[in-house]
Amino acid sequence: MMITLRKLPLAVAVAAGVMSAQAMAVDFHGYARSGIGWTGSGGEQQCFQTTGAQSKYRLGNECETYAELKLGQEVWKEGDKSFYFDTNVAYSVAQQNDWEATDPAFREANVQGKNLIEWLPGSTIWAGKRFYQRHDVHMIDFYYWDISGPGAGLENIDVGFGKLSLAATRSSEAGGSSSFASNNIYDYTNETANDVFDVRLAQMEINPGGTLELGVDYGRANLRDNYRLVDGASKDGWLFTAEHTQSVLKGFNKFVVQYATDSMTSQGKGLSQGSGVAFDNEKFAYNINNNGHMLRILDHGAISMGDNWDMMYVGMYQDINWDNDNGTKWWTVGIRPMYKWTPIMSTVMEIGYDNVESQRTGDKNNQYKITLAQQWQAGDSIWSRPAIRVFATYAKWDEKWGYDYTGNADNNANFGKAVPADFNGGSFGRGDSDEWTFGAQMEIWW
């Protein structure tokens, strides 16, 4: 008995050590931004985005507190085989008060198993909700290839000249389909599951310092038995992507060409959309029709120009041509140079221009935006974070068209359509004006 009692403290210590080691193995990653800002004409900070554009130049032009908190852990490992559990909870508030209630979004919860298939060394099996191989332009917060959501897949299969990845994910639309009631009355209240099937071939070395990635995505509306879509709904579509990445000037340049059809055009990033119906009456549900095509040509990157200068840049042309004439032509160009006074202090400027032409009206909206920021960051790279910055932003815009969301679809035949700025004596778009804002912001990723 005495021997047992003497061994007990040692056993407890060993158990505590094991539990401590396991606790220390938890990975904590994430992203956050928050700050305070004012508008020159009075009131809180207002942000500037061109009507019809899918993004905006973000430096000194973000008006919310946003965070993603990721917890993950390698829960099992034997040799080169392992299982990893990953989670991500995100939230966004308007940064107007101390207490701002919000419903967090559970954006990731997945398990990734590496090297589980003997004859596919280096590959990963995964299932669950996941940010899946996302491609974006940081300076405009624009995701041009992103099929994230609940799904499953097999990735990084070594095929000799590259890595092959296969995945299936889902994005549902509210009110996407109906069941038959009586007297030809349909009640569009059932969600429609939109499935996306993704095939990618990446890391193909085609020139010194250059790699090529090719991808095909097929999206479709997956209806339940005895349900139907509204007439004209976009049932399926394709997205084709080619991306060349070149190492240059201690950074990279990415050149991207994408072509999409029908349900893959509205978001243009790989998620299927077009079966959703915002109104019970299918007579007024025309606005979900996105049959047509999209072409996107994009070049972006980040480079170092000597010891003291870094720069991000982007140039993009996007043409969404829809059968219902509600598409757009959008082109944007911008730069973000950074001058480093010390390894932790810099001055950053961002200059961006957007131009969006309405397919329906032929009119154009444009905006110039310039931001000057003094910044303190954890390192001497344009990617170094955390960063604390004080900024001043000036924007000038001239908008000739907007979307008509007055009333509702039952009493407005133009609901959701592009109209000229002065349509029917109204005021659509943001008109011709300018404004400036100033404030302070922190940004961090880890």
Curated annotation (Swiss-Prot):
Annotated membrane topology: Multi-pass membrane protein
MF term (GO), any: porin activity
Top-level division of the source organism's lineage: Bacteria
Expression induction: By maltose.
Keywords of this entry: Cell outer membrane, Disulfide bond, Host cell receptor for virus entry, Host-virus interaction, Ion transport, Membrane, Porin, Receptor, Signal, Sugar transport, Transmembrane, Transmembrane beta strand, Transport
Annotated Gene3D superfamilies: Porin, LamB type
Transmembrane found in the keyword field: yes
Keyword Aminoacyl-tRNA synthetase in record: no
Signal peptide coordinates: 1-25
Name of protein: Maltoporin
Organism (species): Escherichia coli (strain K12)
Record lineage: Bacteria, Pseudomonadati, Pseudomonadota, Gammaproteobacteria, Enterobacterales
Gene that this polypeptide is encoded by: lamB
